[in-house]
């Protein structure tokens, strides 16, 4: 039995010969090397990282209850790549700060963030974590977690609905997919300069 191989029609070299753009591109690739392999690896690694984010929760109020609802069977955030919430910061990729953060809790939250491996992400959930909420004018409340941590995604609400939490988590996935893993994930520049100021 004879197997028929399809012929692949290629573009003749003569069509490329007089194209200045292609000649300049080939010259540039020959001089400086190519980043095609690194780009493909970036895409593959970011796909894996974005679809296997493990959250660490720092919940102090009603927003934490909504986060529990997202993890339950009705919403099931595991189907979007957010597996079981981790209890240790060393196993987590992102921290979800939900609820009022007091000045006394701020150093503990900062220590948890510092113990996470890079690259790490922060989601501020609810009005209390974003801006202090109804306790904003109180002397002991931190007016937003972004005073001590670099926040990647803000999810407003008091408390936000489970659908809003899922949407915010999916937005974080999109952000992770767009990052450059090789030479691009440097989060130190995004951190607040003086955490004691808060």
From Swiss-Prot:
Membrane disposition: Peripheral membrane protein
UniProt keyword terms in alphabetical order: 4Fe-4S, Cell inner membrane, Cell membrane, Iron, Iron-sulfur, Membrane, Metal-binding, NAD, Quinone, Translocase, Transport
Keyword Plastid carried by entry: no
UniProt keyword annotation of Disulfide bond present: no
A GO-annotated cellular component: respiratory chain complex I
Catalytic reactions on record: a quinone + NADH + 5 H(+)(in) = a quinol + NAD(+) + 4 H(+)(out)
Gene3D superfamilies: 3.40.50.12280
Cofactor, free-text remark: Binds 1 [4Fe-4S] cluster.
Pfam family, one: Oxidored_q6
MF terms in GO: 4 iron, 4 sulfur cluster binding; iron ion binding; NADH dehydrogenase (ubiquinone) activity; NADH:ubiquinone reductase (non-electrogenic) activity; quinone binding
Signal peptide: none
Any GO BP annotation: electron transport coupled proton transport
Main subcellular localisation: membrane
InterPro entries named among the record's database cross-references: NADH_UbQ_OxRdtase-like_20kDa, NADH_UQ_OxRdtase_20Kd_su
Localisation per UniProt entry: Cell inner membrane
Residues given in the record as [4Fe-4S] cluster binding sites: 62-63, 128, 158
Cofactor(s) needed for function: [4Fe-4S] cluster
Cited PROSITE patterns: COMPLEX1_20K
EC number: 7.1.1.-
NCBIfam families: nuoB_fam, PRK06411.1, PRK14816.1
Biological role: NDH-1 shuttles electrons from NADH, via FMN and iron-sulfur (Fe-S) centers, to quinones in the respiratory chain. The immediate electron acceptor for the enzyme in this species is believed to be a menaquinone. Couples the redox reaction to proton translocation (for every two electrons transferred, four hydrogen ions are translocated across the cytoplasmic membrane), and thus conserves the redox energy in a proton gradient.
Subunit structure: NDH-1 is composed of 14 different subunits. Subunits NuoB, C, D, E, F, and G constitute the peripheral sector of the complex.
Protein family according to the UniProt entry: Belongs to the complex I 20 kDa subunit family.
Protein name (record): NADH-quinone oxidoreductase subunit B
Lineage: Bacteria, Pseudomonadati, Bacteroidota, Bacteroidia, Bacteroidales
């Amino acid at each position: 039995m004879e197997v028929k191989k399809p012929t692949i029609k290629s573009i003749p070299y003569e069509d490329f010969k007089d194209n200045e753009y292609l000649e300049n591109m080939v010259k540039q690739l020959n001089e400086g090397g190519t980043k095609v392999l690194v780009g493909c690896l970036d895409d593959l690694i970011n796909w894996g990282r974005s679809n296997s984010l493990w959250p660490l929760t720092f919940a102090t109020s009603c927003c934490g209850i909504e986060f529990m609802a997202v993890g339950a069977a009705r919403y099931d955030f595991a189907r979007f790549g957010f597996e079981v919430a981790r209890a240790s910061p060393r196993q987590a990729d992102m921290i979800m700060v939900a609820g009022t953060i007091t000045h006394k809790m701020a150093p503990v939250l900062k220590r948890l963030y510092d113990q996470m491996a890079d690259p790490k992400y922060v989601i501020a959930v609810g009005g209390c974590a974003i801006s202090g909420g109804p306790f904003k004018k109180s002397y002991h409340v931190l007016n937003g977690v972004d005073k001590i941590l670099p926040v990647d995604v803000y999810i407003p609400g008091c408390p936000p609905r489970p659908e809003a939490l899922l949407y915010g988590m999916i937005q974080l996935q999109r952000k992770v997919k767009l990052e450059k893993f090789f030479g691009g994930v440097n989060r130190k520049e995004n951190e607040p300069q003086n955490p004691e100021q808060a």
